[in-house]
Swiss-Prot record:
Family as reported in the entry's similarity comment: Belongs to the FPG family.
Lineage: Bacteria, Pseudomonadati, Pseudomonadota, Gammaproteobacteria, Alteromonadales
Superkingdom as given in the UniProt entry: Bacteria
Record key words, sorted: DNA damage, DNA repair, DNA-binding, Glycosidase, Hydrolase, Lyase, Metal-binding, Multifunctional enzyme, Zinc, Zinc-finger
Start-end of FPG-type zinc fingers: 236-270
Binding site for DNA: 90, 109, 151
Protein name: Formamidopyrimidine-DNA glycosylase
EC numbers on record: 3.2.2.23, 4.2.99.18
Catalytic activity reported: Hydrolysis of DNA containing ring-opened 7-methylguanine residues, releasing 2,6-diamino-4-hydroxy-5-(N-methyl)formamidopyrimidine; 2'-deoxyribonucleotide-(2'-deoxyribose 5'-phosphate)-2'-deoxyribonucleotide-DNA = a 3'-end 2'-deoxyribonucleotide-(2,3-dehydro-2,3-deoxyribose 5'-phosphate)-DNA + a 5'-end 5'-phospho-2'-deoxyribonucleoside-DNA + H(+)
Active site: 2-3, 57, 260
SMART domains: Fapy_DNA_glyco, H2TH
Amino acid sequence: MPELPEVEVTRQGIAPHLEGNRVEALIVRNANLRWPVPELAQNIVGQTILGVRRRAKYLLIDTQAGTTIVHLGMSGSLRVLPKNTPVEKHDHIDLVMQNGRVLRFNDPRRFGAWLWSELPEAAHPLLEKLGPEPLSAAFHADYLQAALKGKKKAIKLCLMDNAIVVGVGNIYANEALFAAGIHPEAEAGKVDAERLTLLTAEVKTILTQAIKQGGTTLKDFTNADGKPGYFAQKLHVYGRGGETCTECGHLLSEIRLGQRTTVFCSLCQTK
């Protein structure tokens, strides 16, 4: 599943081809995504793209008339192509631009979304309850300590809770907790301020590195020009259960936590 760095890399890749350009057509070949593509999505036709933003794992394509909200789901991707590029399997939507380019949405598993909103961002049901961006100044140790106060849930589950902080999915939660030396099952409300300071710093560092390297390549992700990401080469724990720890040589443990695979070093990471 594309996580925050992959979505941000996609945003950076498509924005220069969309911003300031006018939409010629919206072609919907298959409207049956996670939610049906609404008829109102056609309201973008004739509009000039004012900006392409990211909020959590949502891409927001802004126009004066409203905003197209795109979610890549489990296997979705957006690519900017010449207008006459032949359509391939799972190419469900084309946003055709007057500059001769097309933004093409491909999604084999169809868990992604293509929606339209004329509401303020803070009022949209998908966006209104989201926590701060992890790379913003609003995400810091004092904030996280207050957000976790009294919580008995595992710290990893809280780190992946979009109401607490957005966009820290399974890959990067595993990696940040390893870098901070925190056991993923540690009771969130009992993690002290010093370790939360380290954790917030590691979240920012790891996400920034992943964005710079084009995201993490797993089964499905390629960025906007079709190239894979390379951060998978840097992973210390994710996907490495049963292998040796890169720091101490101990075998990495693998468990299920919140129905997600969780990998950690029981020596380097403490509760």
